[in-house]
């Protein structure tokens, strides 16, 4: 299972330098039977990005993209974990993404993000990360 944060999901709707490599990487992962997920937070954030920056028709494309993902709920235990997970410098919404991904830790093969602070937090808690196309 691949967890995608909003920085990754956005690249699938709004063309950015990493978009092509991300799509290629996801196609390869899908060919190996990998499913993808995000959290309820990722869903809300993506729809807000589309509302702010999207072109006509992107709301429908965003909903189609989200329909193909497992949407992980933000339960009370997830919120409780978000209060303490990762480094103290981790931003609140990033901590929620980490805690949401922790729900699928056993199945998690990669946490896809392009956010440097979130990448650091992922590594601190032991998640394998991927940022296809990013220059590090």
Curated annotation (Swiss-Prot):
The keyword Nucleotide-binding does not apply. Its EC number is 3.1.-.-. InterPro entries: PIN-like_dom_sf (IPR029060), PIN_dom (IPR002716), VapC_family (IPR022907). Residues 2-104 form the PINc domain. SUPFAM superfamilies: PIN domain-like. It comes from the Bacteria. GO terms for molecular function: magnesium ion binding; RNA nuclease activity. Mg(2+) binds at residues 5, 94. Its cofactor is Mg(2+). Gene3D superfamilies: 5'-nuclease (3.40.50.1010). It holds the Pfam family PIN. It is an enzyme of class 3 (hydrolase). Keywords: Hydrolase, Magnesium, Metal-binding, Nuclease, Toxin-antitoxin system. Belongs to the PINc/VapC protein family. Toxic component of a type II toxin-antitoxin (TA) system. An RNase. Its toxic effect on colony formation is neutralized by coexpression with cognate antitoxin VapB47. This is Ribonuclease VapC47. The lineage of its organism: Bacteria, Bacillati, Actinomycetota, Actinomycetes, Mycobacteriales. The gene is vapC47.
């Amino acid at each position: 299972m691949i967890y995608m944060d909003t920085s990754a999901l956005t690249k699938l709707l709004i063309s950015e330098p990493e978009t092509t490599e991300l799509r290629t990487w996801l196609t390869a992962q899908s060919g190996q039977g990998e499913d993808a997920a995000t959290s309820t937070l990722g869903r809300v954030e993506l729809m807000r990005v589309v509302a702010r920056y999207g072109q006509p028709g992107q709301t429908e494309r965003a909903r189609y993209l989200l329909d193909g993902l497992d949407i992980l709920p933000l339960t009370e235990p997830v919120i409780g974990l978000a209060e303490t997970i990762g480094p103290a410098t981790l931003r609140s919404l990033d901590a929620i993404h980490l805690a949401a991904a922790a729900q699928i830790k056993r199945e998690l093969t990669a946490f896809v993000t392009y956010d440097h602070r979130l990448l650091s937090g992922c590594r601190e808690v032991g998640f394998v990360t991927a940022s296809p196309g990013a220059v590090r």
